[in-house]
A protein has these predicted regions:
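Alpha-helical scaffold segments in soluble metabolic enzymes
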Residues: 22, 26, 57-64, 84, ...
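A short, charged helix-loop
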Residues: 87-120, 155
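Short, structured coil segments at secondary-structure junctions
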Residues: 1-3, 185
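Conserved beta-loop-beta/alpha segment of the NTase-like Rossmann-fold superfamily
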Residues: 5-90, 135, 139-140
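Short glycine- and hydrophobic/aromatic-rich loop-to-beta-strand nucleating segment
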Residues: 124-128
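Fold-independent oxyanion-binding glycine-rich loops
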Residues: 11, 39-41, 48, 72-75, ...
Length: 236
């Protein structure tokens, strides 16, 4: 059950870095050493127990280190709608240093990534300690921090709403991936297999949909398909 006080409403759309930074400041005001899970609302998780275990493992990792953690998914196709993580040396406890981030590559490059075995999908599921992510923002996104840090004694009080309404719209429009994850040198990845899918791409929707014997998927329509295989048909 969520309490109304646990819901933070953005007064303007400014991509993912500002809202995550605001949440970190707000949570730190309530718990100065909190560990956070960042989870997009439109992702599908089919294996809940495996997912829960991955989250517990990840939170334990970030609670004892100043590291930013993302969950990586082994790709089963050259998807151009996802970001990719190239893994570096393992830490010995099931985590890997991130070597590179690549955001939504062209098809040919995505094919190379999948064939190499070194690249994993970036799930967009992140974990970190509040102080670690705020420190990263201070280094890499000083313009953003200049808008939100002055409210450090205001967060989680009755004055927070007015402060955010005044300052949040002036935050730079930047994603957490581009603003921090692609630039920080303390990013690690844990590889997961918990039935993850980002429903924001046609490929992921196809994988999850019922198909006919020729591999065709028909959504929101009745269609007659002649001599067609592995298609997806969607009518508005």
């Amino acid at each position: 059950e969520l309490d109304e006080k646990q819901i933070l409403l953005e007064p303007a759309r400014r991509n993912t870095a500002p809202c995550i930074a605001w949440a970190a400041y707000h949570i730190r005001a309530l718990n100065p050493n909190a560990n956070i899970v960042v989870a997009p609302s439109d992702h599908l998780i089919l294996k809940e127990e495996e997912f829960r275990a991955a989250i517990i493992k990840g939170l334990e990792f970030v609670s004892h280190s100043e590291k930013l953690l993302t969950l990586g998914i082994k790709p089963n196709r050259p998807e151009t709608g996802y970001g990719y993580i190239q893994i570096d040396e393992p830490t010995g406890d099931g985590f890997y240093k991130v070597k590179t981030f690549t955001e939504k590559p062209e098809l040919e490059l995505a094919k190379v990534f999948v064939e190499s075995g070194e690249f994993y999908w970036n799930s967009g599921l992140f974990m970190w300690n509040v102080n670690t992510i705020i420190k990263a923002a201070e280094i890499l996104l000083p313009e953003l921090v200049s808008k939100l840090a002055p409210g450090k004694n205001i967060y989680a009080t009755d004055k927070e709403k007015a402060f955010i309404e005044e300052n949040f719209p002036a935050c730079p429009n930047v994603s957490i991936d581009f603003g921090i994850m692609e630039k920080a040198d303390n990013v690690y990845v844990s590889l997961g297999d918990f039935g993850w899918s980002d429903l924001g791409t046609w490929g992921s929707l196809y994988d999850l949909s019922e198909r006919d014997r020729e591999g065709n998927v028909t959504l929101k329509s009745h269609s007659l398909i002649y001599n067609g295989k592995d298609n997806m048909i969607v009518l508005p």
